[in-house]
From Swiss-Prot:
Family according to the record: Belongs to the bacterial ribosomal protein bL19 family.
GO BP: translation
The name this protein goes by in its record: Large ribosomal subunit protein bL19
Cellular component terms (Gene Ontology): cytosolic large ribosomal subunit
TM helices/strands, residue ranges: none
Keyword Cell membrane belongs to the record: no
A GO MF label: structural constituent of ribosome
Amino acid sequence: MTNKIIQQLEAEQMSKEIPTFAPGDTVVVQVKVKEGDRSRLQAFEGVVIAKRNRGLNSAFTVRKISSGVGVERTFQTYSPQIDSLAVKRRGDVRKAKLYYLRDLSGKAARIKEKLS
């Protein structure tokens, strides 16, 4: 019985519309940032290097290079802190987890674009 209640609550919280994306895609995540009494949106653009599909507990990791330093950020897919998610570019990769990109830099870290 409690299982049905939990499923119902999770279904309500997962009502947010999220575009389909996969590892290798370049995405722009608009994150709500609260500074003092005001709040604003902060864009985080990078390549999805990992995706974890677990219903309400789903998450994805985005990697970008900021002034020569690699920055990774893990987002909960259905978090209220995420305002919007947009896919800028589809990547053509063969692996589900792109952790090898951490060791690559410059042109070697590029990902081919999926043509379709």
